[in-house]
């Protein structure tokens, strides 16, 4: 959709004045040269058509199109806020598709730019819209609403405002997660949202324990029964169980030591059964969760002893060198890469350090807790993760990065290295990486795959 910022200027009063989304949409449609007699609330088709004729402020995709380029232009903060006001109005539209698009547009904007003051003033309105869409919406709309709730809490950070959001939305999210008749995709997104919002906002230990129990009741349904000796077959519920397990693992990292000990006793001997699931994503989620549990256990007791270590390492080694012809090559490569690291963590207490670069800064991920936390927020924020690592005080506190670094354009320019120096650095890094990977690579893993 073309960018029509200047065309919107004369009509700003019509949408910001709270006259209703339908009136704003109809006015914008007339200004855009459409001479039809549009009735936005007559039915869903009319409402969708109205939205398609709205000027730039109501087009959620315009955030993705404009991106950082728009945010660098003069006066763009006002334009961005004007677009967001229009999208907030459209969350009340009668059309489900219009509401969903508006929710996604707001989420994309909040994921790509810090707008703390703007949403602080409108947090109650946004919370009401999310609550309404979660209660009355269907699958895609509920997913969009839950995703927006996560980003909203990330923007606000820990505090009374986020606590109020969790207090309002928490019971609804829990109800959807446990509702067997609800869409599986919606339940999956709500499980992730519930974990993220609780991680950020909860200040009540009983509420934290209640959330852990809710998530446990979901993913433990994938555990093998005592009499079962066969492989766990994936079901439509597997995606929900994966999201619940990952959200549960995230919350476990902020639990008191006594609670962590209880959870370790409950799950340490049952969680390995998920490694036999025929879904590669479940196997990977279970493996990474096990590595994190070992890290927590050894952090509490340096001489921690696991009784079934031999059988567990055999299972992990088999997954790290899996050559099963009945599995996709991409899945096998992904699985082998992950389980080589998991095996090293369990056997040698080792973690392969990763470096995340954002702007002029670097962050080193040197433990499973940090990796899991980063992966969770990366899943929620997508491409906006790097921006939030630079600007979001909450995330910088989580990853111990200190206050945001404020650098002007001239300073940034002097920090850049020349192309030749960058080439030398990349060549050396490539050579070192190749040597390191060749040591870990199992050269026999792919033998026989093409026969």
From Swiss-Prot:
Expressed in a variety of tissues. Residues 1-69 are annotated as: Disordered. Keywords: Developmental protein, Differentiation. GO terms for biological process: adipose tissue development; fat cell differentiation; muscle cell differentiation; myoblast fate determination; negative regulation of axon extension; negative regulation of collateral sprouting; regulation of transcription by RNA polymerase II; skeletal muscle tissue regeneration. GO terms for cellular component: nucleus; sarcoplasm. SUPFAM superfamilies: ARM repeat (SSF48371). Residues 23-33 have a biased composition (Low complexity). Residues 49-61 have a biased composition (Polar residues). InterPro entries: ARM-like, ARM-type_fold, IFRD, Interferon-rel_develop_reg_C, Interferon-rel_develop_reg_N. Residues 1-10 have a biased composition (Basic residues). Could play a role in regulating gene activity in the proliferative and/or differentiative pathways induced by NGF. May be an autocrine factor that attenuates or amplifies the initial ligand-induced signal. Belongs to the IFRD family. Interacts with PSIP1/LEDGF. This is Interferon-related developmental regulator 1. It comes from Homo sapiens (Human).
């Amino acid at each position: 959709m073309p960018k029509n910022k200047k065309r919107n200027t004369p009509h700003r009063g019509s949408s910001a004045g709270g006259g209703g989304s339908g009136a704003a949409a109809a006015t914008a449609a007339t200004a855009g040269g459409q001479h039809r007699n549009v009735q936005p609330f007559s039915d869903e088709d009319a409402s969708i058509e109205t939205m398609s004729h709205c000027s730039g402020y109501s087009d959620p995709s315009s955030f993705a199109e404009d991106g950082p380029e728009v945010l660098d232009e003069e006066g763009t903060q006002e334009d961005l806020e004007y677009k967001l006001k229009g999208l907030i109005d459209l969350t009340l539209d009668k059309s489900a598709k219009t509401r969903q698009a508006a929710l996604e547009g707001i989420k994309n904007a909040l994921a790509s730019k810090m707008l703390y003051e703007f949403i602080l003033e409108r947090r109650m309105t946004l919370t009401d819209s999310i609550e309404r869409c979660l209660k009355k919406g269907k699958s895609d709309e509920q997913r969009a609403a839950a995703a927006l709730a996560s980003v909203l809490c990330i923007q606000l950070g820990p505090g009374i405002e986020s606590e109020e959001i969790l207090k309002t939305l928490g019971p609804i999210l829990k109800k959807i997660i446990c509702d067997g008749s609800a869409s599986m995709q919606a339940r999956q997104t709500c499980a992730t949202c519930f974990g993220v919002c609780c991680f950020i906002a909860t200040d009540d230990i009983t509420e934290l324990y209640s959330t852990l129990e809710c998530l446990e009741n979901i993913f433990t349904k994938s555990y093998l029964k005592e009499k079962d000796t066969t492989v766990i077959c994936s079901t439509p519920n597997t995606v929900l169980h994966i999201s619940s397990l990952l959200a549960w693992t995230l919350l476990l990292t902020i639990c008191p030591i006594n609670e962590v000990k209880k959870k370790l006793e409950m799950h340490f001997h049952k969680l390995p059964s998920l490694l036999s699931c025929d879904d590669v994503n479940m196997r990977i989620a279970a493996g990474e969760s096990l590595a994190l549990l070992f890290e927590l256990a050894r952090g509490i007791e340096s001489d921690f002893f696991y009784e079934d270590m031999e059988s567990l390492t055999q299972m992990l080694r088999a997954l790290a060198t899996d050559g099963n012809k009945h599995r996709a090559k991409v899945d096998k490569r992904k699985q082998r890469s992950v389980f080589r690291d998991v095996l090293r963590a369990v056997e040698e207490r080792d973690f392969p350090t990763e470096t995340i670069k954002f702007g002029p800064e670097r962050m080193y991920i040197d433990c499973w807790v940090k990796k899991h936390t980063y992966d969770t927020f990366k899943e929620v924020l997508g491409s906006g993760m790097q921006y939030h690592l630079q600007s979001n005080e909450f995330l910088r506190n989580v990853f111990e990065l200190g206050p945001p670094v404020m650098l002007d354009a001239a300073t940034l320019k002097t920090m850049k290295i020349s192309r030749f120096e960058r080439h030398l650095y990349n060549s050396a890094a490539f050579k070192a990486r190749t040597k390191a990977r060749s040591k870990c690579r199992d050269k026999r893993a792919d033998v026989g795959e093409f026969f």
